[in-house]
């Protein structure tokens, strides 16, 4: 059939004919499965489905005192692709992806904080109510800011992206400051009752850095002496060679 090779579509018929012709062995177990679920006969591949970005906003419509939800569909311009990449799956994007990118760009050290990635049932997010920043059973982190900002954009009338970001950050800073104060008070109370704490992670890191610096300084001093001795010996040999 021209350039199309349809041998794979006839694999079941080939196996049955081989057994019928007296070939030794049993009929493969997959023969009945392939008979129930035959291979596709369509030779034309369809391009992958496009995934538009849908945004929900609350808008105040003139003449209507109640704000109405408005869904904005942002269609992505389809760029011409190479033939080898034409049928690759299309990337799925969500609105919070951009919000998350902006927050961690402004707060890169939030990525250094330890995070819990294990979920008990996989539906933990369904129990959260992002009308407020702090959620029971969830540690305060950058994702809290992202979800809080998204809730403000979806539920507060005429809310802009920058204003929602400022509100979410202000609440986040206030709660983070409260956590720091509680941590300091707990340490002071423990030390007042006789507790002794070891070096912090920052102090341990500085000590390791100092050790590496001292080792490098010793190595650099030795290398400098070797270079000086080599240059001195070369100067001496040149002076001896002169008449």
Swiss-Prot record:
Q: Say if the entry is tagged with keyword Repeat.
A: no
User: Where is it chiefly localized?
Assistant: mitochondrion
Any GO molecular function? structural constituent of ribosome
Would you indicate the residue range of the signal peptide? none
Q: What protein family does this chain belong to?
A: Belongs to the mitochondrion-specific ribosomal protein mS23 family.
UniProt keyword list: Mitochondrion, Ribonucleoprotein, Ribosomal protein
Question: How does this chain assemble?
Answer: Component of the mitochondrial small ribosomal subunit.
Could you confirm whether the keyword RNA-binding appears in this record? no
- State what protein this is by name: Small ribosomal subunit protein mS23
- GO CC terms of this entry: mitochondrial small ribosomal subunit
Pfam families named in the record: MRP-S25
Where is the protein situated, by its record's location annotation?
A: Mitochondrion
Q: Which domain of life is it from?
A: Eukaryota
